[in-house]
């Protein structure tokens, strides 16, 4: 586990931003917790995929942040990108709803659930908690991940401009309270969570995908190609 949980796993741009965070006491406690969990229980994602979001989207490349909660707890689902599943894996209900809204909004129809190409285009697909015990949602909440991902968001707020933060659900909004003091530098799109329990309360019809590209176009930045390969 030690090799999977070192800062040199990250792109240099993230290492520079998070170097001080890595040595904080809560990170040592989190490392010890994860070492115990991975050695005794089934934990998702695989160790090498814990930081896939940061590996896929370097700090200087982030244009959009889509915040999730914690990884999917089912076997073979989580691979380190929020809301995403590996190629060939059945789409979870939240992702089905995301794709339904995407199709209604911009006419793009996706059938594969791997969102890697979105990450490659500058969308940081970040969960607020990066690991989970198999079959037990939120089982790794309150162990330090929230503090770490808050630090990631804070670095983006302070050291980047014109990032589009997409907040789906109350948990994402709470995580990004800092954003509401930084709206002059960043854009915020908020809606209900895409889960079946909440999607009809404001996720469907939010048009976030077209709004993201509208904002990027205004900034003279390349728009996102939402079609997955």
Curated annotation (Swiss-Prot):
Enzyme class: hydrolase
Record organism: Chlamydia abortus (strain DSM 27085 / S26/3) (Chlamydophila abortus)
Superkingdom, taxonomy of origin: Bacteria
One Gene Ontology cellular component annotation held by this UniProt entry: cytoplasm
Annotated function: Excises uracil residues from the DNA which can arise as a result of misincorporation of dUMP residues by DNA polymerase or due to deamination of cytosine.
SMART domains documented for this protein: UDG, UreE_C
NCBIfam families, per database record: PRK05254.1-1, PRK05254.1-2, PRK05254.1-4, PRK05254.1-5, ung
InterPro entries for the chain: UDG_fam1, Ura-DNA_Glyclase_AS, Uracil-DNA_glycosylase-like, Uracil-DNA_glycosylase-like_sf
Catalytic residues in the record: 70 (proton acceptor)
Keyword Membrane: no
Keywords attached to this entry: Cytoplasm, DNA damage, DNA repair, Hydrolase
Reaction equations catalysed: Hydrolyzes single-stranded DNA or mismatched double-stranded DNA and polynucleotides, releasing free uracil
EC assignment: 3.2.2.27
Family affiliation: Belongs to the uracil-DNA glycosylase (UDG) superfamily. UNG family.
Keyword NADP among UniProt keywords: no
GO molecular function: uracil DNA N-glycosylase activity
Any Pfam family: UDG
Annotated localization: Cytoplasm
Coiled coil location: none
Gene Ontology biological process: base-excision repair, AP site formation via deaminated base removal
Protein name, UniProt field: Uracil-DNA glycosylase
